Amino acid sequence: MWYSAHAICYFSYFGQDSFLVHENVYLVEAGGEDQAMLIAKQVAAEHEDLSEDGHLEVNGNKAQYRFAGIRKLIEVELDSETGIGKLHSGVETTYSVLEVDDFSEVERLAAGEMTSVLYRE
């Protein structure tokens, strides 16, 4: 089975007053949900950057890139009706549920522009 693993990672540096957070989505193949979670944690942890040599900076501050955890794990629904039964173009691999205050925010979100959202999951 295939899973989409939503990993939360963040930048850490001395004296910060807010956190820049990334949600990285990894495609994981596993025999079940427990195994997928273990693999997802391993994959995400391998992307940490804990070096202190200064090559990674946030707002001029030496930073580290840290893995916080797996926020959600979603089983990818393969298209059984077509008989394909495998990953192919057009398969939905993940989703998110968001809420905004008005339609102009829907349009900004769809255009990739910054807007405020309420994450519903």
Q: Where are each of the predicted segments found?
A:
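A short, exposed loop/beta-hairpin motif centered on an aromatic-Gly-Thr core
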Residues: 20-31
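Short structural boundary motif marking the start of a folded domain
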Residues: 1-5
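Generic short beta-strand segments
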Residues: 6-12
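A short, charged, amphipathic alpha-helix used as a generic interaction element across diverse proteins
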Residues: 32-45
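Short consensus segments that form the blades of beta-propeller domains
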Residues: 15-19
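Short, mixed-charge low-complexity intrinsically disordered segments
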Residues: 46-121
